[in-house]
């Protein structure tokens, strides 16, 4: 957006300088006439010798000429102020036209951004409704659609809004005894629940205002379901908690698309670049996001703020002003990105890992880079405070990299005094940064006692080193944590996204290598030249990092695909392809690319729109109804993590394990609970469950036999973890045949079996 304004300003100013030059030429003649007049009037020009006495006719002619000259001089002095006023008015008129053009450009950019934001919001709402028929589901069915950790997060939103007051609800989730019974935990600190707290406050405020004025907030009706399902009541409108909750999420992600447009427009220098970013996102929508299928996940709240943060960082890298506001905005967007999601710190670490080599070779001036590091440090500190001293923020690779970067910046001059070559100077700084970051990370983890917590970096390390144990297999056997599908690059190619980005990356890489080679050859820093393209180098490095992450963990495509869409906007950049646009019409090139993109892109959109379904899960509904009406409110349950989240959400019964698997203590509990799918003895498992105060165990027959891929059935995972019992029969099969004497079957349907722990 801002880039567009700058370019229009340049065009206007160049026109102004030309007209000003023309006015300058006309005005330049007037002092010459004036000077000539003054010379003649004062007798500055000498007559030939012997001609001092002139004839009367000559004197008269001289008088007439002198009178004419005096008249011209008088007119010049009289017209001078008017000419000045006229020139000033012309300049003012041009300035107004320039401001109007910039305002028009800004308004156009903002208008398009609002339009694409609304378009994306409608797209998300349509896909979500088509998939589940959410508007016609009962409250219980809507809660069941939030499976696994989604149900866990939504349960805290439900707790707050159903409490007598907002503050009481806040106190309840900060002193939660239901989730890891009998432990009392601060759920905000453990599960990053600021989104639920904020949305709950909005919901309570909205309902309070609507009730004050007596306005209806929802419409309810009875829905007749297929036999043997009974009739249920379904409500639609912002007064329904589930509708309000997902509505806020879709609005936020709709706004994200408007931000993508402005991001692409600013990076490429043209609004057409922003449109290419948006179209690429829509054409590759299934590869770019999953918010329409899984709204409550942490990434749905967090990722839009990463887009904002990267847009602000691009502005900082491109401009050379000392304005503090972009740096403050960078700090706040970092906080907004980190608070909702535990994996956000690792993504910010990849940013620092991309920025540091740019600083080393001279793409970023030290003072600017130092400010960026300080803002990141402040954002970590603020997040640590707001998350009630969550030590994960201080023991991450991100925090360690910030400290090492700060130390290297301070010691830079001392390293230079070693008198090494430029290349060795770079290698020393890079080696010190990597080694120092890794060592500092492990030291802080040990000191703060969080070395046993699983992070995204641990999963990536397990992938690279091919290390497996019970905990890593629980993660990596899930489809979203598998390697990238082989068909994904083909899908990128069909929409022309991959070829376009590869061409852009090659041009940036070629220019970067040429610049760095020249720096090494001349042994000087090309700060002015390199600073102009630092944002391009940064985006290229981030693209490489996101590509590596997406290949290792499929779920991280959510970072790669949108970033590729932003990079695709650079096909409109005259900075990169000005040589091409001077030979071929700019519009023809872009129109041709968009035409080819839209062939497969439109087919992808039609495939998404064709997904029509209606949610129902009768076995789980029967289970939840039985628990709600056939057990006491203090009965404690254990079982598969996804099912436990649903039990807590819909029945409010205590559970001992849940899907938020990063915490070391929780993983130890889950390991005990999942031992029913091992080859251990029934007595040993029963005794361990009693230590956790479990009253009922929910056994799922599918978990006894399901195998997502080789080595990923629960029995195979346990054989890796517990080889000493590999010869014993599976406990799950024993319990399905006859659970006595250590367990008693009290409920059973086609999927679930509830065992009372004796």
From Swiss-Prot:
Annotated TM spans:
108-128, 195-215, 242-262, 263-283, 297-317, 344-364, 372-392, 423-443, 489-509, 534-554
Pfam families the UniProt entry points to: Dpy19 (PF10034)
GO CC field: nuclear inner membrane; nucleus
UniProt region (Disordered), positions on chain: 1-58
Q: In which tissues is it expressed?
A: Widely expressed with high expression in testis. Not detectable in ejaculated sperm (at protein level).
Q: Which residues lie on this side of the membrane: Nuclear?
A: 1-107, 216-241, 284-296, 365-371, 444-488, 555-758
Quote the annotated effect of residue 309 to K. In SPGF9; uncertain significance
Q: Which CDD domains match?
A: Dpy19L2
**What are the recorded GO MF terms, alphabetically?**
mannosyltransferase activity
Q: How does it sit in the membrane?
A: Multi-pass membrane protein
Q: Which residues lie on this side of the membrane: Perinuclear space?
A: 129-194, 318-343, 393-422, 510-533
EC assignment: 2.4.1.-
Reported effect, residue 192 to R: In SPGF9; uncertain significance
Question: What highest taxon heads this organism's lineage?
Answer: Eukaryota
* PANTHER family per the UniProt record, alphabetical: C-MANNOSYLTRANSFERASE DPY19L2-RELATED (PTHR31488:SF6), DPY-19-LIKE 1, LIKE (H. SAPIENS) (PTHR31488)
On subunit structure and binding partners, the annotation says: Interacts with FAM209.
Which family is this protein grouped under?
A: Belongs to the dpy-19 family.
* Disease linked to the protein: Spermatogenic failure 9: An infertility disorder caused by spermatogenesis defects. The most prominent feature is the malformation of the acrosome, which can be totally absent in most severe cases. Additional features are an abnormal nuclear shape and abnormal arrangement of the mitochondria of the spermatozoon.
Q: Give additional notes from the record.
A: It has been suggested that DPY19L2P1 is an inactive pseudogene from which DPY19L2 has evolved by duplication. However, expressed transcript sequences derived from the DPY19L2P1 locus are known to exist.
Q: What does this chain do?
A: Probable C-mannosyltransferase that mediates C-mannosylation of tryptophan residues on target proteins. Required during spermatogenesis for sperm head elongation and acrosome formation. Also plays a role in acrosome attachment to the nuclear envelope.
Provide the protein name: Probable C-mannosyltransferase DPY19L2
Recorded source organism is Homo sapiens (Human)
Lineage runs:
Eukaryota, Metazoa, Chordata, Craniata, Vertebrata
